[in-house]
């Protein structure tokens, strides 16, 4: 697995992390990894579920509709911007505070 492979199957969010004893901490949470040391953590936009919460830790920057789905750009408190993709069941607007739930990540050694 590599970042090249991850990018070839879509436009994932790639985060840097360092894993100790199979646990890697990133700016989007803590995850289990089969690798130790410096890692890239790939999170596909459709693996990030947003929920509107007035006390949320993230802020929606923009939402782009594609008919069958939508891509939501959101920012953490460090100013890093990430993308989520979901069905248009919930309408997100710039400035909405949200929380996230991540269903799946892929890790691989950093180049």
What are these regions (language model features)?
Residues 12-14, 18-111:
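Non-catalytic connector elements of ABC transporters
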Residues 1-10, 14:
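Conserved beta-strand-loop-alpha-helix hinge in the C-terminal portion
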